[in-house]
Amino acid sequence: MIFRIACFLFGATLLAQTNPLWHEQKIKNYLPHMTWPEVQELLTRSDMVIIPVASIEEHGPQTPIGTDYLSGVERAKLIAQKTDVLVAPIILPGLSPYHMEFPGTITISHDTLQRVYFESAQSLIHHGFRRILFLNSHAGNQFLTSYVADRINQETAAIAVELGASMRGAARTSTFDRHAGVAETSGAMYLFPNLVDLSKAGKNDLTLPEHLNKALPQVVAGDAVATQVFLAEALKPKETGKHTSTREMSATGVWSERDTRESTAEQGRAATESFVNAAVAFIEKWKTLRPLAPLADRQAK
């Protein structure tokens, strides 16, 4: 009897010895957590897949290098809890050459990224997904996702769109606030709070070329021409000689005139819920415009 009890306790101890770092719960419709039969079952109900794409790049001293990627994936997960759609993250890094002066940033070439995006979408199309929604959380990727979406539309049986295109428009402020600023920090505080260190936040001094600095008020005011030419020149690799790499314009990597100590989880919650609700409305509207085809007609023979 004692031997049996000892064996039972030893077996229970072995079962309890699992990875102490793993705290993730299984998320509905999140591809990395699913089995293939679960994906097959989802395909009978939906032909839609969100592909979050973003970056691995510096985000100042207060928010993590994975801010863009985590923001995109977490928002996509929230969307998938409200409407039947698969979430399929495919790659963490993006196009970030202008951040390379900050340690930890990873950048991938245009050609490599567009091939990975397109070929990953092709795999999902092969399985029967016919509506591809790119959720891009990094401005540097925007022209790539536009190109790949158009290529999917031109070369495959699927239809691809950029999910954020019809729901952009963060609240306009009277002060310049972009990369790693109050808006992004607030979003991080809501979506992944344990990775934000607000004690390292503060007021940032921008060191833009004089003509770009003079254009800032027009950019903040929403002038279309000023914004277009400003962004065409700003945030470019140091090697271009434009003096607009992130490090050349900001010693901390924060591209904002606001004090990031103003960031709050409540601001992040409001912005996130607004985006998620708009995305869900977009998806539900698309479902009414294009009925779901039978799975047998969608899967490769």
Identify what each model region corresponds to.
Residues 1-8:
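Sec-dependent signal peptide recognition
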Residues 8-16:
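Hydrophobic h-region of N-terminal signal peptides that target proteins for export
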Residues 17-85, 89-97, 103-108, 115-131, ...:
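Extended, histidine- and acidic-residue-enriched regions that form the cofactor-binding/catalytic faces
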